[in-house]
């Protein structure tokens, strides 16, 4: 099956056409949420601000850059406070500039002024840089292995034979952390095998196909998973193609999932 995605200029071709409202600091997450809700964009809450130190400063900075430059992103509005560790004006030049804008709350009339300007600028970005449909020559499929997956070898072989590039992340037992790393690897679709004691999850920028185990929790939440334990490789590939061509996953429909910025240093 051929895949038709969205051409996002320097970001490449994605399978979703998301606008990202990127709060550069915890203090701007509330305003970012209001703007995103008004214009139908994606945003996220996080706890990163003046308290991040050491290697987490470039680490979180690079994570924000990866988010903003992901192929599933159409355009970006960075919302900064003005006195944080990771400064919005320093972040913006590292993002695809033509499709990005910056608002600084302390320079834009406070929260209310930033909200009004943010809604206006987000709409202008969407209207001025409309995405064009384009054929996707290479689909990067991420595998979140938060639990043991008996048929992993057969799955990887099948996905590769189907023409997909496969990226695997299995460091964490909590899917959210693995999903963040798969995002940085530019995975456009993710297959998630959540831990038996964890519910299905998602990632706002990336469609996540959740495959259940036979644990009591997963059986109780069976309707929230896209596929059951024991689904064949052919069934997985068929669903990947459908999702890449626009069919929404269960997590996309329900709106579940968070963006978690990786942290290494304990800080206040």
What do the PLM-derived regions correspond to, one by one?
Residues 1-193, 199-268:
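Metallocofactor- and cofactor-centric catalytic cores in central/energy metabolism, strongly enriched
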């Amino acid at each position: 099956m051929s895949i038709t995605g969205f051409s996002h200029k320097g970001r490449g071709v994605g399978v979703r056409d998301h606008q990202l409202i990127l709060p550069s600091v915890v203090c701007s997450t509330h305003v970012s949420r209001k703007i995103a809700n008004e214009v139908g964009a994606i945003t996220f809450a996080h706890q990163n601000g003046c308290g991040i130190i050491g290697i987490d400063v470039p680490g979180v900075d690079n994570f924000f850059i990866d988010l903003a430059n992901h192929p599933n992103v159409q355009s970006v509005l960075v919302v900064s406070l003005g006195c944080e560790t990771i400064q919005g004006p320093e972040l913006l030049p590292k993002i695809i500039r033509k499709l990005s804008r910056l608002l600084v709350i302390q320079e834009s009339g406070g929260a209310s002024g930033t909200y009004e300007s943010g809604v206006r600028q987000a709409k202008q970005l969407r209207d001025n840089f409309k995405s064009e449909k384009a054929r996707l020559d290479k689909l990067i499929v991420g595998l979140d292995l938060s639990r043991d997956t008996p048929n992993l070898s057969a799955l990887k072989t099948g996905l590769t034979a189907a023409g997909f590039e496969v990226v695997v992340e299995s460091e964490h037992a909590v899917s959210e952390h693995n999903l963040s790393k798969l995002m940085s690897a530019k995975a456009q679709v993710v297959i998630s095998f959540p831990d038996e004691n964890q519910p299905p999850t998602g990632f706002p920028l990336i469609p996540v196909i959740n495959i259940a185990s036979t644990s009591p929790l997963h059986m109780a939440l069976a309707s929230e998973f896209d596929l059951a334990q024991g689904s064949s490789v052919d069934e997985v590939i068929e669903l990947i193609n459908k999702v890449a061509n626009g069919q929404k996953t269960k997590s996309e429909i329900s709106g579940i999932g968070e963006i978690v910025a990786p942290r290494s240093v304990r800080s206040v």
